[in-house]
UniProtKB/Swiss-Prot annotation:
Motif JAMM motif location, chain numbering: 173-186
Boundaries of every MPN domain copy: 102-224
Protein name per Swiss-Prot or TrEMBL: UPF0758 protein PSPA7_6095
InterPro entries attached to this UniProt entry: MPN, RadC_JAB, RuvA_2-like, UPF0758, UPF0758_CS, UPF0758_N
Family label: Belongs to the UPF0758 family.
Example GO biological process: proteolysis
Source organism of this protein record: Pseudomonas paraeruginosa (strain DSM 24068 / PA7)
Pfam family, one: RadC
């Protein structure tokens, strides 16, 4: 049965317009993105099949071009469309942070950092540079690979803070394993960077670790 033959209240697009996007299931949201199904399979049925094949919505969204296009109903055009949607979401979050103080929008900070780093397959260390009103000046990835005390250089972080004329910053890195709990090396690195940046009067407000769930804040655990 085509989606057009469904009761109007059950059609994903009509349901979204009437009740809001948050009320839709992953399959319904994906069906709206797909727009059409394939022969003998509605968009919602195709969406359910794809979610089953990928294992989760997150896995689908974070797949590379080859993996994405290896599934029935998906191709290069859809992949490009998906990347554009994801980038618009990241830019929307970045715009919120440039407009408001990060202290007034803590969830926006978490959402933005999660959007930027959670999909990375390798460890990435980055900084969110802030002005005197704690608005975002820039986001920069500074180091990639195995993030530990030996691979992250305080001198480089200080150099970039001075280049942006930053008054404060937020440190962040991801754990590709999905476990956001900080290691002893993570905590020692945070202390070293905090000490180095204090010499140029730049405050380290927090260090977020990005895993599978909500970003973990070292400040909230008293580890700053």
């Amino acid at each position: 049965m085509s989606i057009r033959d469904w009761p109007e209240a059950e059609r994903p697009r009509e349901k979204l317009l009437e009740q809001g996007a948050a009320t839709l299931s992953d399959a319904e949201l994906l069906a709206i993105f797909l727009r059409t199904g394939v022969t003998g399979c509605s968009a919602v049925e195709l969406a359910r099949r794809l979610l089953g094949e990928f294992g989760s919505l997150r896995a689908l969204l974070e797949s590379d071009l080859a993996a994405f296009c290896g599934h029935l109903g998906l191709g290069v055009a859809k992949y490009a469309q998906l990347q554009a949607v994801l980038e618009m979401g990241r830019r929307h979050l970045a715009e919120r942070l440039r407009r408001d103080s990060v202290l007034e929008s803590p969830q926006a900070v978490r959402d933005y950092l999660k959007a930027r780093l959670r999909h990375e397959q390798h460890e990435v260390f980055a900084c969110l540079f802030l002005d005197t009103r704690h608005r975002v000046l820039a986001f920069e990835v500074l180091f990639q690979g195995s993030i530990d005390g030996a691979s992250v250089y305080p001198r480089q972080v200080v150099k970039r803070a001075l280049a942006h004329n930053a008054a404060a910053l937020i440190l962040t890195h991801n754990h590709p394993s999905g476990d956001a709990r900080p290691s002893l090396a993570d905590r020692q690195l945070t202390a070293r960077l905090k000490e180095a940046l204090a010499l140029i009067d730049v405050r380290v407000l927090d260090h977020f670790i990005i895993g599978d769930g909500e970003p973990l804040s070292l400040a909230e655990y008293g580890w700053m």
